[in-house]
């Protein structure tokens, strides 16, 4: 109520992507295909983990939550982008804009925490294989997931409430394809220093520290594997960490660059491209990087298909 009492505008205008009119249809088809790939890939992972008891392990508990987070993360922004591209109506109500920002932060933060949990799970599995079951107990894993949801909900609500207290005057044009927090702060006509300090401090806790923990976990994994100096060991280290670290670097690199270390001469096009990387590309790649190409998931898919063909097959 506070935000609505102080603001003199009822909606914002999302400029969307800087593309030419003749490219609209092609871009619409491309983003629709990427969004459907994200939905189907992540839904398949969730269903397989739910149906196959062989996948009821800590790693796949984290993976199922990551897939749900990716699915929701993309669904917060991409449907509105597709709607605007199709209808040529860039407006979004004030309340809807804050709601979109809230859930964007929630699921983005949740992904950050889950990536840390997955890195720690791999660290324990490779460096302490004999103690894996004792360390990664069901209670610990469920507690980590529950705590991640609580912390991300609190963080998203904090930023939403701080944004709602700001005044927005004449300028309501957001040069972005979603209600980005930094873009909204630039439109505010009241003091935003508190918001900026909270972004910097909480961003360090939510983004930078998890990123460093992930790098530390994978560094220990590589160090542990390379203690056996063999070509096979090196290949195993690279296959274990290389693809995972590429997605982690893509996600955290763009987030840190956009929100914690913004460039003074940063252009709207550059910011939009960087945002597309972690809102569209990363959620689409995660199912392929983390799950769909490994033997456990392929085996689970085969077992589920066989059970559907022969219900009496155990």
Curated annotation (Swiss-Prot):
SUPFAM superfamilies attached to this UniProt entry: Family A G protein-coupled receptor-like
Extracellular-facing ranges: 1-25, 80-100, 159-196, 261-272
Membrane protein topology class: Multi-pass membrane protein
GO terms for biological process, alphabetical: signal transduction
Subcellular location: Cell membrane
Keyword Transmembrane included in the entry's annotation: yes
Transmembrane feature ranges: 26-49, 58-79, 101-120, 140-158, 197-219, 237-260, 273-292
Positions of disulphide bridges: 97-189
Keyword Cell membrane listed: yes
Family of the protein in this entry: Belongs to the G-protein coupled receptor 1 family.
Protein name: Olfactory receptor 1E2
Designated gene of the protein: OR1E2
């Amino acid at each position: 109520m506070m935000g609505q009492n102080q603001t003199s505008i009822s909606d914002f205008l999302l400029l969307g992507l800087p593309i030419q009119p003749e490219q609209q249809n092609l871009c619409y088809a491309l983003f629709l295909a990427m969004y459907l790939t994200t939905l189907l890939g992540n839904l398949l992972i969730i269903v397989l983990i739910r149906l196959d008891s062989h996948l009821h392990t800590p790693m796949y508990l984290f993976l199922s939550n990551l897939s749900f987070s990716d699915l929701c993360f993309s669904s917060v922004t991409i449907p509105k982008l597709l709607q605007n591209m199709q209808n040529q109506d860039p407006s979004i109500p004030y309340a809807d804009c804050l709601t979109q920002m809230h859930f964007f932060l929630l699921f983005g933060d949740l992904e950050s925490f889950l990536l840390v949990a997955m890195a720690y799970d791999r660290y324990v599995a490779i460096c302490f294989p004999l103690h894996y079951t004792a360390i990664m107990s069901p209670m610990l894993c469920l507690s980590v997931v529950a705590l991640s949801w609580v912390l991300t909900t609190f963080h998203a609500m904090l930023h939403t409430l701080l944004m709602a207290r700001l005044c927005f005057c004449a300028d309501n044009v957001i040069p972005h394809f979603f209600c980005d927090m930094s873009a909204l702060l630039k439109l505010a006509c009241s003091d935003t220093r508190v918001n900026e300090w909270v972004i910097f401090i909480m961003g360090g806790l939510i983004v930078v520290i998890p990123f460093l923990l992930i790098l530390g976990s994978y560094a220990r994994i590589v160090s542990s594997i390379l203690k056996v100096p063999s070509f096979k060991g090196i290949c195993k280290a690279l296959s274990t960490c290389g693809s995972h670290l590429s997605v982690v670097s893509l996600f955290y690199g763009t987030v840190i660059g956009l929100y914690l270390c913004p460039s003074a001469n940063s252009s709207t096009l550059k910011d939009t491209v960087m945002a597309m990387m972690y809102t569209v590309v990363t959620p689409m790649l995660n199912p392929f990087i983390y799950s769909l190409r490994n033997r456990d998931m392929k085996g689970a898919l085969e077992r589920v298909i066989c059970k559907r063909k022969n219900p009496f097959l155990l």
